[in-house]
Regions:
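PLP-dependent class I/II
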Residues: 1-147
Length: 147
């Protein structure tokens, strides 16, 4: 590890050295795009994420019915889930964390008086197994902590 007194000088030196992208990398990326590889990559990622989104929506429907109502997003990598009446965002976030599922709350994203309660569920980096496992753990933690 770098001694604390050297962190700032090294950070400044590194920012000077890395101030621009080398031409060879720019040319490589240009060729990658010209040859259609970028578009191919985008198509593959859209297909991958659409599949994960469907798996997440199915898992929400199967395990969290009566707790949240999921909105089907047209894009993005997160699913907004709105809490059903009788469920508190603060309480559900604590219960989720106790089950090893960290969720951002929806209410903090709203300006004004009428804030929706719920969470955002991300799926970009998760496998089908991880999605199913997380939704099952989350549902169990929420249902056990309801009373």
């Amino acid at each position: 590890a770098l001694p604390p007194e050297l962190v700032k000088p090294f950070t400044q030196a590194r920012s000077i050295m890395d101030g621009h992208t080398p031409q060879i990398l720019q040319l490589t990326l240009a060729r990658f795009m010209e040859d259609g590889h970028y578009n191919s990559h985008i198509r593959a990622m859209r297909k991958l994420y659409a599949g994960r989104r469907e798996i997440m929506l199915e898992a929400i429907e199967q395990h969290l019915q009566g707790i949240v109502r999921a909105a089907r997003p047209e894009g993005g990598l997160q699913i907004p889930c709105f809490l059903e009446p009788g469920w508190s965002e603060e309480h559900t976030l604590r219960r989720a964390l106790s089950a090893g599922v960290q969720l951002p709350g929806l209410s903090r994203l709203y300006i004004g008086e009428e804030k929706q309660q719920g969470w955002l569920l991300g799926y970009a980096s998760l496998t089908a197994y991880e999605i199913e496992s997380a939704m099952l753990r989350l549902a169990n933690a929420l249902r056990q902590g309801k009373g």
